[in-house]
């Protein structure tokens, strides 16, 4: 039995910014502000409170709500110790179906001192109301053990709420690394808490086949298991180098067969049914994906007649695909999906359709014959022929098809739904909706949750406006919603998966649910801070948000102040200045620290249970104003040299052949530069006055910044969108500047410059060459 009080969590708010002072208050729970994620449309609150009685019952006015009532009882009973019964008719808490204004999923939640009523316009609406009720209770309600000393009180409220988008989803890739059915259920629990209603299950890929298909047993007997590949080996390396057990390969996913160490796992069809039922109770639909025509190596390596040639493997970029010219291959695909469709009741199935290596098709006589017979001019049209054929097959079985945005390229059918992921394919949303097709937004720049999170990631999701991508406002109703994708090449464990997905998942949930007119980042940050205690009690291994108040490099003149803040009020910060990794025995950061000499700090956050978080290094550099040079450049802007570069280090760009030279007004990729990109940008920056300047360099992939011959920012190496910030003290006048950048299918480069007052300096008149 756990002994603690509801107010005890307030003492954990040891490190937070002034932004979060509202989250750390000793106000009694009965009059606390409502702090729900995602933000409800309308909340009315008074000073009275409802206190959960031991005699609490949950009443239902419709038998279809029995699973929802049992679900709610399962939330409330363990921590309170109350034996909460479900009954027909009214109860202390009453669940009902009825007319509620708004899209499907709308609900009303009304509480007074004696009763709680939740009414939804659908089963999903009642579940949404339950999740709001759940967040009104103290976070200890999430405990699986009885918690003593808590007033199970909630404020008296009237909430009228409805979703903004119908689709609020998360995709989990279980092929690259496998997650057990219980680990999937745990993710579904978090999704439900934040009113997310679509779970996209990426069940197969080159690296593993994860679903039992009874007609083709080798798919799981062999296709579900592999020797350690390059992804596994890199995860193991990182687990050792960074002392991070979350990057280790779980022993439960390893077996020894004839002396070989194999990694993998799969779901039986009974497992699949169990997870579907679990999700249904929580108002979540499951969308299965068997990715084809590409990403099928786990299948084509085990069955003949599926690929173009007997020899399979990797082409120029991607793996050998299914052969759309062979009837046997098409029969195989339809047989697989026939079993899948029998298992999954939701109307959508996802065919994938992305990243297909078409080289084999050009050489394959079967593919070329198929093209001639159907008057197809290109291999892209051949892919579309296959997609359309499969879609008709799905439609005949009562299903609708979703595909990644590549399915647009050879011609889009009238009934397909597109999932837009390639942020660089800017015309895909308008092209899709212009043809009248629905679209789901999951652009990789913001919504790929396998990309390393930084201090801007959550805000970038929260502030994203999907409608800005649709040129014709009349087509905006075709936007079904948003989805975050967790690709798992580098995510080997349940702990790492949760770390990468959360708290970004909460921002996606709010973007998908809440009214855009109510968008307020600071208010969301306060509500987000209130969620961490709840997630801790749920044993969710979320990522502690980045520490704030400093840059990667910080310049000071005379005396500097290290003033650190953290969005998570439960986080504890420890630090060292000798380069060693902080532990709980290292000095604890509990307030501003003065520095008078150049000092290297290493910070590390710790969860309430003592588990360490990220390691952050920063340098505070004692500086003088670097003198300006006597140059008098006559041309505005900067000079960019484009190299035909295929490497992954900025220092090697100049070795590659030159494709062209360009004048640019700001730090950017010139419009004509495409393909293999290595840029060396040179010129001068004109400091308007003696000051300490802050440079924020955002790139996807690598970049570096050098000023006056000194490196200010190192953002090198292949990576997703990442911003690194550094400072330098500059005297008034011109200073030589060099930015290097390379692209490995990212296509983002920009830099913001601000003075010591924090105001961004416009690029106009800032650069010259």
Regions found by a protein language model. Give the residues of each.
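Short, compositionally stereotyped local motifs that mark structural "simplifiers"
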Residues: 8, 12, 59, 515, ...
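C-terminal motif of bacterial Sec signal peptides marking the signal peptidase cleavage site
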Residues: 21-23
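Short beta-strand-plus-loop segments that form exposed binding edges in beta-rich domains
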Residues: 738-747, 753
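Hydrophobic helical h-region of N-terminal Sec-dependent signal peptides
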Residues: 11-15, 19
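Contiguous, structured surface segment used for ligand recognition
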Residues: 25-165, 496, 512-523, 530-534, ...
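Active-site neighborhood of glycoside hydrolase catalytic domains
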Residues: 299-304, 310-415, 422-436
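Feature activates predominantly on carbohydrate-active enzymes
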Residues: 102-104, 108-321, 326-330, 338-348, ...
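Flexible, acidic glycine-rich loops studded with aromatic residues
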Residues: 401-406, 411-416, 422-563
């Amino acid at each position: 039995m756990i002994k603690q009080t509801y107010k005890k969590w307030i003492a954990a708010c040891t490190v937070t910014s002034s932004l979060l002072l509202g989250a750390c208050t000793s106000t009694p729970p009965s009059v606390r502000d409502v702090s729900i994620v995602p933000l409800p449309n309308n909340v009315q609150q008074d000073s009275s409170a409802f206190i959960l009685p031991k005699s609490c019952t949950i009443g239902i006015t419709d038998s279809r709500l029995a699973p929802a009532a049992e679900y709610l009882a399962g939330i409330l009973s363990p921590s309170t110790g109350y034996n909460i019964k479900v009954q027909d008719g009214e109860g202390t808490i009453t669940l009902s179906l009825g007319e509620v204004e708004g899209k499907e999923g709308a609900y009303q939640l009304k509480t007074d001192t004696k009763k709680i009523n939740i009414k939804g316009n659908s089963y999903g609406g009642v579940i949404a109301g339950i999740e709001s009720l759940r967040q009104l209770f103290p976070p200890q309600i999430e405990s699986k053990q009885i918690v003593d000393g808590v007033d199970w009180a909630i404020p008296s409220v009237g909430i009228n709420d409805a979703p903004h988008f119908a689709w609020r989803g998360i995709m989990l890739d279980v092929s690259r690394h496998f997650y057990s059915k219980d680990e999937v259920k745990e993710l579904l629990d978090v999704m439900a808490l934040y009113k997310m209603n679509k779970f996209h299950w990426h069940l197969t890929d080159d690296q593993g086949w994860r679903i039992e298909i009874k007609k083709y047993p080798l798919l799981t007997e062999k296709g579900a298991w592999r020797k350690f590949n390059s992804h596994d080996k890199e995860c193991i390396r990182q687990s050792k180098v960074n002392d991070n057990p979350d990057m280790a390969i779980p022993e439960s996913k390893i077996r020894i067969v004839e002396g070989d160490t194999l990694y993998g796992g799969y779901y039986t069809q009974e497992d699949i049914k169990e997870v579907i039922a679990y999700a249904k109770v929580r108002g979540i639909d499951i969308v299965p994906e068997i990715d084809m025509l590409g990403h099928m190596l786990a299948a084509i390596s085990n069955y003949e007649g599926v690929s173009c040639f007997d020899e399979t493997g990797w082409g120029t970029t991607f793996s050998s695909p299914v052969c759309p010219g062979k009837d046997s291959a098409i029969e195989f695909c339809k047989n697989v999906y026939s079993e899948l469709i029998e298992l999954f009741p939701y109307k959508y199935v996802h065919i994938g359709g992305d990243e297909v290596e078409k080289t084999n098709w050009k050489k394959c006589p079967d593919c070329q014959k198929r093209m001639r017979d159907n008057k197809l001019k290109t291999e892209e049209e051949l892919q579309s022929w296959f997609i359309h054929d499969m879609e008709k097959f799905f439609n005949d079985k009562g299903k609708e098809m979703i595909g990644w945005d590549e399915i647009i390229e050879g011609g889009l059918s009238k009934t397909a739904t597109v999932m837009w992921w390639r942020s660089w394919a800017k015309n895909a949303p308008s092209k899709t909706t212009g043809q009248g097709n629905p679209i789901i937004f999951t652009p990789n720049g913001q919504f790929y949750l396998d990309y390393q999170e930084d201090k801007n990631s959550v805000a970038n999701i929260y502030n994203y406006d999907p409608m800005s991508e649709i040129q014709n406002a009349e087509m905006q109703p075709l936007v079904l919603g948003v989805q975050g994708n967790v690709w798992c090449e580098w995510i080997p464990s349940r702990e790492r998966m949760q770390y990468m997905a959360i708290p970004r998942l909460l921002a996606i949930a709010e973007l998908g649910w809440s009214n855009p007119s109510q968008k307020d980042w600071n208010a969301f940050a306060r509500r987000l801070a209130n969620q961490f205690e709840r997630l801790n009690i749920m044993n969710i291994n979320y990522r502690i948000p980045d520490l704030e108040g400093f840059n990667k490099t910080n310049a000071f003149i005379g005396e500097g102040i290290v003033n650190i803040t953290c969005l998570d009020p439960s986080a504890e910060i420890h630090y060292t200045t000798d380069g060693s990794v902080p532990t709980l025995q290292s000095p604890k950061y509990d307030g501003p620290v003065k520095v008078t000499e150049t000092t290297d700090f290493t910070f590390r956050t710790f969860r309430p249970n003592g588990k360490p978080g990220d390691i952050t290094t920063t340098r505070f550099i004692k500086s003088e104003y670097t003198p300006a040079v006597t140059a008098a450049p006559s041309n505005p802007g900067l000079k960019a040299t484009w190299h035909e570069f295929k490497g992954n280090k900025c220092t090697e760009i100049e070795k590659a052949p030159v494709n062209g030279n360009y004048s640019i007004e700001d730090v950017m990729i010139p419009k004509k530069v495409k393909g293999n990109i290595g840029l060396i940008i040179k010129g001068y920056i004109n400091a308007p006055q003696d000051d300490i300047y802050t440079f924020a360099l955002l790139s996807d992939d690598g970049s570096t910044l050098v000023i006056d011959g000194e490196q200010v920012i190192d953002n090198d190496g292949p990576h997703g969108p990442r911003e690194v910030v550094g400072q330098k003290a500059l005297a008034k006048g011109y200073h030589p500047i060099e930015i290097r950048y390379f692209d490995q299918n990212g296509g983002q480069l920009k830099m913001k410059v601000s003075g010591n007052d924090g105001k961004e300096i416009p690029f106009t008149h800032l650069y010259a060459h």
